[in-house]
Each structure stands twice: as structure tokens, then as C-alpha cells.
């Protein structure tokens, strides 16, 4: 998947230096080449803000997004409450280069381990946020663990997971928790293929990012706040904002 290519991201970040841009917002990948590119932009006086996924680099102005550790903990809490019995739960992770996925997994595992020890968590690296990749991975999981009772998809590719669950005839009995409300996941909530969406309002992310960067450029004081973690089910879809 091209979204997981650090060299491409680093090249595009460096190209921003010659495009007359005043500031750059980006979704980071954990890779030395990306860190180097951000440091170079900082050297040119171009401020940068990380969005959606955390990034430990002193050159950035700040991070805008949800508390992803909290999002993972929320998913773990809901999984445990929806599955009050012993069983296996799978984590589908999009990729190791996004800190957001690491944070969500840590939060999820922490809550399951401390509050719901009767659940056995198995982890897979999944299909790198790809629909077909997640479909294949979910098919393998269902074949290997026929007693699987819950799935937490940390990243994208929800359509692939639902397709596999439906083909196996287990969508209605599987507890499935994923991220980001879209026209697809909205329908999955309505037909029962998904139980819960952990959501971040991307409109708020964009607005907060612009405020952060403009305040920095104008040397104004800016009090940054985290974007709220939203929990969406089929019962509170009305008025919910898509990603």
C-alpha cells in the first residue's frame, strides 16, 4: 500500500520547501527519513503539524487528533462489556509505521488484560488498511480460530472484514468494533455487521490544524485541545459527521 511508503512521504515533505508554502500538516509515518524531512522543513522556517497519528519530533508545532490510547481503551471496554463470556478476540492492525495503530493496540490490550482477563487476545498485522488485504486476513483468522467471538480493527479496510464475516455467516454473532464513520461503515452499523464505530471528526481536525498553524505563524498564543473520541452505534447515527 502506497500510504505506508516513508520514502514517498519524505520526498513530498521536502518538495514543500520549494512550493512557497507557509506551513505543512501531514499524517506521519515512524521512519528516520520522515524525521529528517521534518527537521529540514523546520530549518527552512516552515512549521509543521502532525495530524491523526502522533509523532515524536521536537521540530513539529503540535499534534491534532484524538487521544488514540484512549480510543483503544474505549474499544477494549466496549468489547468486554459486549462479550461477558470467555472467548477469543482478534486485533487487526493496519501497519507498524503509524503510531496511531500502536497507541490503539496498547490501549485495547491494557483494558482487556486488566478488566476482562477472560478474553484471549490474538493479534495480526492485517491487510495494511487495504480492503482485499483485510478480507484475506479475516478469512484466515476465521479458519484458524472458529471460536472467534470478537474483532477490533485498528485501521481501515472495514469492507474487507465485513465481507469475510458475511461469507462465513458469522457477521450477526461476531462483535465487531472499528474506526471512522463513512457511508460504508454507516450501513454496516445499520445492518448489524458492525457494532461500534470509534470516530474522530475530521472536520474538527482540519479546523484545529488551521488554527494551530495560523497562530504559530502570527506568533499568537494558542491553547490546543484534543479532538473528542466519539462512540457511534446504529442508535445515534442521526447527525453524525462522516470522516
Predicted regions and their residues:
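Flexible loop/hinge segments that line or gate small-molecule binding clefts
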Residues: 33-70, 182-190
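Short hydrophobic segments within beta-strands
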Residues: 51, 92, 152-153, 232
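Hydrophobic alpha-helical
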Residues: 23-42, 108, 126-184
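A conserved helix-loop-strand patch within extracytoplasmic ligand-binding domains
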Residues: 71-89
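Hinge/beta->alpha junction and helix N-cap segments in small-molecule ligand-binding domains
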Residues: 1-8, 30, 64-74, 91-110, ...
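Hinge/cleft segment of the Venus flytrap/periplasmic-binding protein
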Residues: 112, 204-243
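Short, high-confidence coil segments that cap the C-terminus of an alpha-helix
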Residues: 21, 86, 145-148, 194
Amino acid at each position: 500500500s502506497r500510504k505506508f511508503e516513508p520514502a514517498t512521504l519524505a520526498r513530498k515533505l521536502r518538495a514543500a520547501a520549494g512550493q512557497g508554502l507557509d506551513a505543512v500538516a501531514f499524517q506521519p509515518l515512524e521512519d528516520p527519513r520522515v524525521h529528517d524531512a521534518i527537521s529540514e522543513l523546520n530549518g527552512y522556517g516552515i512549521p509543521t503539524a502532525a495530524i491523526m497519528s502522533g509523532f515524536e519530533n521536537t521540530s513539529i508545532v503540535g499534534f491534532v487528533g484524538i487521544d488514540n490510547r484512549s480510543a483503544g481503551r474505549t474499544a477494549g471496554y466496549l468489547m468486554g462489556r459486549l462479550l461477558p463470556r470467555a472467548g477469543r478476540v482478534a486485533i487487526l492492525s493496519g501497519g507498524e509505521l503509524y503510531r496511531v495503530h500502536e497507541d490503539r493496540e496498547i490501549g485495547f490490550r491494557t483494558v482487556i488484560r486488566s478488566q476482562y482477563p477472560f478474553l484471549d487476545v490474538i493479534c495480526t498485522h492485517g491487510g495494511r488498511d487495504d480492503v482485499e488485504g483485510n478480507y484475506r486476513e479475516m478469512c484466515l483468522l476465521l479458519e484458524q480460530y472458529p471460536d472467534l467471538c470478537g474483532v477490533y480493527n485498528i485501521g481501515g479496510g472495514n469492507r474487507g472484514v465485513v465481507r469475510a464475516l458475511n461469507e462465513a455467516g458469522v457477521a450477526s454473532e461476531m462483535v465487531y468494533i472499528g474506526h471512522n464513520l463513512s457511508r460504508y461503515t454507516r450501513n454496516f452499523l445499520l445492518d448489524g455487521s458492525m457494532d461500534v464505530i470509534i470516530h474522530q471528526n475530521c472536520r474538527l481536525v482540519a479546523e484545529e490544524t488551521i488554527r494551530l498553524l495560523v497562530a504559530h505563524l502570527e506568533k499568537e498564543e494558542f491553547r490546543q485541545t484534543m479532538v473528542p473520541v466519539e462512540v457511534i452505534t446504529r442508535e445515534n447515527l442521526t447527525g453524525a459527521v462522516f470522516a
